[in-house]
Swiss-Prot record:
Keywords: Cytoplasm, Glycolysis, Lyase, Magnesium, Metal-binding, Secreted. HAMAP family: Enolase (MF_00318). It is found in: Cytoplasm; Secreted; Cell surface. Belongs to the enolase family. InterPro entries: Enolase, Enolase-like_C_sf, Enolase-like_N, Enolase_C, Enolase_CS, Enolase_N. It comes from the Bacteria. Binds a second Mg(2+) ion via substrate during catalysis. Mg(2+) binds at residues 242, 286, 313. This is Enolase. The active site is at 205 (proton donor), 338 (proton acceptor). NCBIfam families: eno. The keyword Cytoplasm applies. Catalyzes the reversible conversion of 2-phosphoglycerate (2-PG) into phosphoenolpyruvate (PEP). It is essential for the degradation of carbohydrates via glycolysis.
Length: 426
C-alpha cells in the first residue's frame, strides 16, 4: 500500500511576481511530485480563503509563509501515513482539519497545493498520466480552448469594461488544428492593432490590452482578425465574453459601463447583450451579471439561456452547494471550474459531477496569477469538461497548459475534439 511519507511547502512566485505555494508530497516508495497553486485577480466573495501573511515588510503583505508553515506542520503531521491513492479520504481529512467552510484556518492555497501534489504523486507512482489516474479509461476528450486575446477590466490597465474577449475554435477536427488557427488569429490581431497605432502590450493572461472607445470595438477588430487570418467567422471560430460584472456593479445592481458612458440596470444590460449576440457570433457569456444579482441572472437565463452558453464563475465559485441553488432556480447553464475557489481536488470533482448530472457545461479554468504548472490541462481531459480557459497563445505560463494538451492529444492518438458538437444542443 502506497502511503504518504513526507509533505513540505515552499514560497515561490506566480506569473504576476506575487508569492504562491509550491507543495510537494513524497510517498512511501520515494515517488515525489509537486504542484504550484494559482491566484486570481477578480475573485468571487464566496471563494475559499487564500491565506496571505499581511506582513507589509514582505511582498507588500502578499507573502504566503503562514500557509507554507501550515503545510509543513499541521497538515504534514496529520497526513503522514495515510493511503496515498485514497484522494477523497485525504481531502476529507484536510477539510476536517481546517474546520471551516472556506479554509479560513489553513488557507485554501495550502490545502489545494497538497491535494494537487498528492494526485500527481499517486499517478506517478502508478506509472499513469495524471489525466488517466483522475479520469480512468473514459478520459478521451480534448477541450475546446477559450482564448483570451483582448484583456480589459481588472486584467489590464485600459479603458475596456469587459474583462475578456475570447475566441473559440469550434470548426476543427483536432485540438492541434484548433490551437494553430487560434495562434494565427492572435498574430493577425497584433498586426491589425499595430496598423491602428494601438497598444500591443499584453495583460495578465497574454491577451492584448489596447485602448478602445467602447466595449464593441474589440468585437469588431477580433472579427476582422478571424476573417483576415482566413477563417470563417462564427462557423470555424466564434466569440465569447467574460464580462466580470461584479466589478462593474454598484449596491443598487446598476452596472457602470465607462466604455459606453452608460449606467444600466439588469434588464437593460441583458437587452444590451441581446443586441451584441444578434450582431456578432457570440456563443458564450461569463459572469454577465453580478454574483449577488440572482434576480437579474434569472432574467438573463430566461432571455438568452436557450441561445448561448451562460457561465457562472463568481456566481458559483466552483461550489456544489451554490451550484445546486442555481440549478433549482434555473440560473445559468454552465459553470467555470477553478480548483482554488473550493479547496481540494475531491470537492472540485463533486462540483463537476453535479454540473454534468444537470446538463450544465463545465469550463476548466486557470487564474490570472498562474505558473508553469499544467495540472488543469490533465484535469480538463480527465473529466471530459469539453472546454478550457487558459489564456492566449502568449506568456509561457499559459503556453504550458496548451503544450501539455498537445502532448496528451499525441498520447491519445488524437483523442476526441468536440468543437463542432459543443453548441449543437443549443
Amino acid at each position: 500500500m502506497l502511503t504518504i511519507k513526507d509533505i513540505h511547502a515552499l514560497e515561490v512566485m506566480d506569473s504576476r511576481g506575487n508569492p504562491t505555494i509550491q507543495a510537494s508530497v513524497i510517498l512511501s516508495d520515494n515517488t515525489k511530485a509537486s504542484a504550484i497553486v494559482p491566484s486570481g485577480a477578480s475573485t468571487g466573495k464566496r471563494e475559499a480563503l487564500e491565506l496571505r501573511d499581511n506582513d507589509k515588510t514582505r511582498f507588500l503583505g502578499k507573502g504566503v509563509l503562514r500557509a507554507c508553515e501550515n503545510v509543513n506542520s499541521v497538515i504534514k503531521h496529520h497526513l503522514i501515513g495515510l493511503e496515498a491513492t485514497s484522494q477523497a479520504f485525504v481531502d476529507e481529512r484536510l477539510r476536517a482539519l481546517d474546520g471551516t467552510p472556506n479554509y479560513a484556518n489553513l488557507g485554501a492555497n495550502a490545502v489545494l497545493g497538497v491535494s494537487m501534489a498528492l494526485a500527481r504523486a499517486s499517478a506517478k507512482a502508478l506509472n499513469l498520466p495524471l489525466y488517466r489516474y483522475l479520469g480512468g479509461a473514459n478520459a478521451l476528450t480534448l477541450p475546446v480552448p477559450m482564448l483570451n486575446i483582448i484583456n480589459g477590466g481588472t486584467h489590464a490597465n485600459n479603458s475596456i469594461d469587459f474583462q475578456e474577449y475570447m475566441i473559440m475554435p469550434l470548426g476543427f477536427e483536432s485540438f492541434r488544428e484548433a490551437l494553430r488557427a487560434s495562434a494565427e488569429v492572435y498574430h493577425t490581431l497584433k498586426k491589425l492593432l499595430d496598423e491602428k497605432n494601438q497598444l500591443t502590450s499584453v495583460g495578465d493572461e497574454g491577451g492584448f490590452a489596447p485602448n478602445f472607445n467602447n466595449n464593441v470595438e474589440p468585437l469588431e477588430i477580433i472579427s476582422q482578425a478571424i476573417e483576415k487570418a482566413g477563417y470563417k467567422l462564427g462557423e470555424e471560430i466564434a466569440l465569447a465574453l467574460d464580462v466580470a460584472s461584479s466589478e462593474l456593479v454598484d449596491e443598487h445592481f446598476n452596472y457602470h459601463l465607462k466604455g459606453e458612458n452608460k449606467i444600466l440596470d439588469s434588464h437593460e444590460l441583458v437587452a444590451y447583450y441581446k443586441e451584441l449576440v444578434a450582431k456578432y457570433p457570440i456563443v458564450s457569456i461569463e459572469d454577465g451579471l453580478s454574483e449577488d444579482d440572482w434576480e437579474g441572472w434569472a432574467f438573463l437565463s430566461k432571455e438568452l439561456g436557450r441561445q448561448i452558453q451562460l457561465v457562472g464563475d463568481d456566481l458559483f465559485v466552483t461550489n456544489a452547494s451554490i451550484l445546486q441553488k442555481g440549478i433549482e432556480k434555473n440560473i445559468a447553464n454552465a459553470i467555470l471550474i477553478k480548483p482554488n475557489q473550493i479547496g481540494t481536488i475531491s470537492e472540485t470533482l463533486e462540483t463537476i459531477r453535479l454540473a454534468k448530472h444537470h446538463a450544465y457545461q463545465c469550463v476548466m479554468s486557470h487564474r490570472s496569477g498562474e505558473s508553469e504548472d499544467s495540472f488543469i490541462a490533465d484535469f480538463a481531459v480527465a473529466l471530459n469538461t469539453g472546454e478550457i480557459k487558459t489564456g492566449s497563445t502568449a506568456r509561457s505560463e499559459r503556453i504550458a497548459k496548451y503544450n501539455r494538451l498537445l502532448e496528451i492529444e499525441h498520447e491519445l492518438k488524437g483523442g476526441i475534439y468536440i468543437g463542432k458538437e459543443l453548441f449543437k444542443h443549443g
